[in-house]
Amino acid sequence: MQITDKKNKIVNLKWIAIGNLPIMTKRGHFILNGAARVIVNQILRSPGIYYQQKIYENYEEKWSQKPKDSYIRYYADLICMRGTWLRIEMDKEKNIWAQMKKLPKIPMFWFLLAMGFSEKKILSFDSGYLIGNLTTTPLEKKEIKKIGSKNSQLNDKTKNSNMKDKKKNKHNSNKTIIRKNSLEIDKNKKSLLSRYSYPYLKTPPEAWEHIAQLFFPQNTPGIAASFSKVPLPSGSAKKARASKNNVENNSKEKKNNFALIGRKWFYNRFMNPRAYDLGKQGRWSFNRKLSLNIKNTTLTGLDVLYATDYLIKVEKGVYKTDDIDHLKNRRVRTAGELISIQIGIGLVRLEKSIREKNFINNKAFNSAIREFFGTSPLSQFMDQINPLAELTHKRRLTSMGPGGVNRDNATLAIRGIHPSHYGRICPIETPEGKNTGLVNSMTTYARINDYGILESPYYKVYKGLVLKNTGIFFLSAEQEEKIKLAAADIFVSQISCLPKALIPVRISEDFTRIPRSQVQFIGISSIQMISIATSLIPFLEHDDANRALMGSNMQRQAVPLIRPERPIVGTGLEARAVSDSGHVLISKKSGFVTHVSANKIVIFSCSMD
């Protein structure tokens, strides 16, 4: 901790214990209050930008089978690691809006202005989509009515002055309000600016004011609100005119303050690194998708502007929508990342308590850690019925939990099997009931890389020759889309050559046959598509899929015997499953066993390491 004395300009550094963390054992679980607990891996949508479409159907009557008409709505979800999710959507009139949860939607033109762009920069893109939704009711008529109801003496004067200003300049009669009466929408025209005059365009401070008016309507400053606090003038017109000038001055100050409120809200929502963070994976996804080169992990104006332009091109058919269920768009949160997120929450609580009380107390930090390990749905009591149950529990992937899917609202698309699951997520082992498809298991050879992406191992193939000596290549689901993969059960000769006949391969999601010279990679094992529990089922290829699912789940419920025996029929993976679970003693060196007793096992080894 750094303690700074501003008067004497002295900086002192001291070590302070801020809390306690449980230590992970060598077997991969935690001991909390004497009980073993496992942090389950969580698989979520990866931070980034995703374009999707939704079809809306209008029925003439409730009992009619065919819809009267239908339309497609395109939208883009801007997903971050920490902060507010933003959605850029296009309605059926092809107007673009920015929307957040539990908040009114904002016209995209206002949103881009608030991000700091000029009118020329925004209108350099396809402006018909951006300014078409600026047709809202003008506010000045309502204000005139309110003023007239408050004061009858000023009613005629304010009406006449407003009418004169309208005739002089339709666009600039009230500069704090965008004038939309002069804008007419022609849906058949791609560009509105070529034929119709566009309204008076706002500067960023006024855009912040409009955004604040949307989110805080009860605090909206205006002439009517200011007039309600001023006593009604009784007497000559001079007093009335003087009071009106005071009201206008007060309203200008309030509008400036209100623009500042909108600006602060906008900064804290999207541009504050402590409140909004895309993460490395999210920033990489934005840069790759939108062809940008930005290092900042917060949301920038260029991100929103180019995302809007990309959405317009998706609607025109230039680009395709994204498959959100593809594993390239999902990542795994391991135990370390989940605990680090909770540590961040604990540090924020600790900072708040230090600022309020001016005293360091580690209760806030410890309570956050205790809350995660004790009450989080991702912290579970470890299944220790047999070694396989423990090993499977630690290799489990769940889509539920904080920030995940709700089991009651999960659709079949989320629960289903995707082609990108091959070699990464087992298609067989999943619970029965409400959690079907939401809780899965990693395959036998799958691994999680530093970015949380699931990878599967393959051998390189060069001109029909399998290069096993060059090592194993781990490929992600996105890398697999661009290469030609052969299955691992294809016959390979003793000199590692593929057969001369056409070889069945998978290219992205399509299956075809190609010559062996065009094959790029081949699987390393025929069991790399199934999990460890499923690989222990003998003759799995002759088993029904439903029975295999029940068998892989019921193996975890088997009670160990007092005198264990070898299985009559096995698959050869039993020893590896038991050794990896940590339930047996494993020698660190190879050698000959010379002595075995209840107290010790002696191994004679020639190695000197």
What is each of the regions a protein language model found here?
Residues S399-P427, G570-K588:
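Flexible, glycine/threonine-enriched loop-and-boundary segments that flank and lead into catalytic domains
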Residues I31, T430, K588:
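Short, acidic, Ser/Thr-enriched surface-loop or helix-capping motifs
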Residues A558-V569, L573:
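Edge strands and adjacent loops of beta-rich recognition modules
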Residues M1-T398, G404, T443-I562, A598:
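N-terminal non-catalytic structural scaffold regions of very large proteins
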Residues S367, E371, G437, H583-H595:
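Generic structural motif
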Residues K589-S607:
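Carboxylate/His-rich catalytic cores and anion/metal-binding grooves
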